[in-house]
Amino acid sequence: MFEYPQGYELIAGVDEVGRGPLVGAVVTAAVILDPNNPIEGLADSKKLSEKKRLALADEIKEKALAWALGRAEANEIDEINILQASLLAMTRAVKSLKIQPHFVLVDGNKIPKDLAIPAQAVVKGDSIVAEISAASILAKVARDQEMEELDKQYPEYAFAQHKGYPTKLHLEKLAEFGALPQHRRSFAPVKKALEQF
């Protein structure tokens, strides 16, 4: 049973989006909510419609005491692996907050080791901790927008549809057109595509 840490005024929630895709950055967000300005309907971003996510993202940015995004690029993911890159991107999001929190709640079961702030990992935190839900929404909206931009650059890959995840469609496009500079070379399907071209 999750309980909020006692004795801390400013608590940030942190989450990441984009561990599974074959392309682009892993994107994180850190959010400190305002207890006097609650937001209705916060939930795990994966369980919300796109329309609801966009509306909530605007409300979070408006009402939160502080929010920030972090990222680790595809080449960093290839260099240090996706887990380490996710943790690095989480640290970057926290360090970018305009107000530094007194405590950080991190989605999942690992805490970035270089946070320098007391922290706790919360499994399924994006469903049970409002701050982490808010972070998951901001990260998902930001990453989806990046995939839509990439889709405009490379329409033949259909990134707006699959958002870079290894769907049947994405794997077909990868086999047909090869890997882009934005693809994660350490991921098996990309490696395979690079060998074929």
Swiss-Prot record:
Domain RNase H type-2: start-end pairs: 9-197
Residues that hold a divalent metal cation according to the record: 15-16, 107
SUPFAM superfamilies in alphabetical order: Ribonuclease H-like (SSF53098)
Cofactor binding remark: Manganese or magnesium. Binds 1 divalent metal ion per monomer in the absence of substrate. May bind a second metal ion after substrate binding.
Cytoplasm listed as a keyword: yes
Protein name: Ribonuclease HII
Cofactor: Mn(2+); Mg(2+)
Keyword Transmembrane helix: no
Organism from which the protein derives: Haemophilus influenzae (strain PittGG)
GO cellular component, one term: cytoplasm
Alphabetical list of NCBIfam families matching this protein: PRK00015.1-1 (NF000594), PRK00015.1-3 (NF000595), PRK00015.1-4 (NF000596)
Subcellular location: Cytoplasm
Family designation: Belongs to the RNase HII family.
EC number(s) on file: 3.1.26.4
Pfam families, per database record: RNase_HII
GO molecular function: manganese ion binding; RNA binding; RNA-DNA hybrid ribonuclease activity
Keyword terms: Cytoplasm, Endonuclease, Hydrolase, Manganese, Metal-binding, Nuclease
